[in-house]
């Protein structure tokens, strides 16, 4: 049986926490920032944990994660 491959897009965009949850960078922070409010830019600074339904989908693409 050959090794399963991890999707490159998933590898770049998501990271696993120590407890096995999936962490993601918040969207809307890459370009066209002059049109966006200060509050929106501040809230888009960090990362967040995916919900359980989305975690199940993403984990299918990360067989060894």
UniProtKB/Swiss-Prot annotation:
Domain of life: Bacteria
GO BP of this protein: translation
Pfam family, one: Ribosomal_L35p
Keywords: Ribonucleoprotein, Ribosomal protein
InterPro entries, A to Z: Ribosomal_bL35, Ribosomal_bL35-like, Ribosomal_bL35_CS, Ribosomal_bL35_sf
GO cellular component terms attached to this protein's record: cytosolic large ribosomal subunit
Gene Ontology molecular-function annotations: structural constituent of ribosome
Record bears the keyword DNA-binding: no
Similarity section: Belongs to the bacterial ribosomal protein bL35 family.
Annotated protein name in UniProt: Large ribosomal subunit protein bL35
Organism: Rhodospirillum rubrum (strain ATCC 11170 / ATH 1.1.1 / DSM 467 / LMG 4362 / NCIMB 8255 / S1)
Lineage: Bacteria, Pseudomonadati, Pseudomonadota, Alphaproteobacteria, Rhodospirillales
The gene coding this protein: rpmI
């Amino acid at each position: 049986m050959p090794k399963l491959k991890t999707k490159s897009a998933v590898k770049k965009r998501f990271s696993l926490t120590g407890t096995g949850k999936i962490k993601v960078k918040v969207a809307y922070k890459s370009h066209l920032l002059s049109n966006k409010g200060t509050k929106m830019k501040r809230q888009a600074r960090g990362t967040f944990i995916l919900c359980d339904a989305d975690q199940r989908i993403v984990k299918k693409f990360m067989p060894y994660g």
